[in-house]
Regions:
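Catalytic cores of TIM-barrel enzymes
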Residues: 1-168
Length: 168
């Protein structure tokens, strides 16, 4: 008989601080929704983009997967690049939208935090509401600075800008 899961996010925190955890934590930086669907036999992807009740069900199922499969934490990221105007160079092979200093100066940098929270606040609230006891979330805003820059500039264009305007 498999024992009832007893997640403890402290195990991952201890390992991260190079302290011996009570037990070795189970962690994955990301688990594909299609993989979770295949393992559990339940739908997730369609719920993720639905209305609020769909999204509640998504987070209930999503967090339950991590608990039931022995994880101490729930991995969740909301991609910053998804709220960037003119995005798509990194993930969708579109031309970058920033090609010059003028484009850079005209870009709505000050709006980005509001756009991110507008899009994802409810998701983080629902994640917190459905977090199993003993677990914590790992992740948050996904994408680093370089990924975000690549997504609105494009890698090739970034190389040209570096040569043409190194101070940018």
């Amino acid at each position: 008989m498999i024992p009832e899961p007893t997640p403890d996010a402290g195990n991952l925190a201890d390992a991260a601080w190079n302290r011996r955890p009570r037990r070795t934590p189970v962690y994955d930086h990301d688990v594909s929704l299609s993989v979770i669907e295949a393992i559990t036999g339940t739908e997730l992807a369609g719920l993720r983009t639905g209305d609020r009740s769909d999204r509640e069900e998504f987070f209930r199922r999503y967090t339950r997967f991590f608990r039931d499969y022995g994880y101490d934490t729930v991995t969740f990221e909301a991609l910053i690049s998804s709220v960037l105007p003119g995005n798509g160079a990194l993930y969708f092979d579109r031309p970058g939208s920033l090609k010059s200093r003028a484009d850079f100066e005209a870009y709505p940098w000050q709006e980005l935090a509001d756009r991110f929270f507008e899009r994802y606040s409810v998701d983080f609230e629902l994640l917190a509401e459905h977090m199993p006891p003993g677990m914590k979330a790992v992740g948050g805003p996904g994408n680093g600075v370089f990924e975000c820059v690549q997504d609105i500039v494009g890698y090739d264009e970034l190389c040209y800008i570096r040569a043409d305007d190194p101070d940018l």
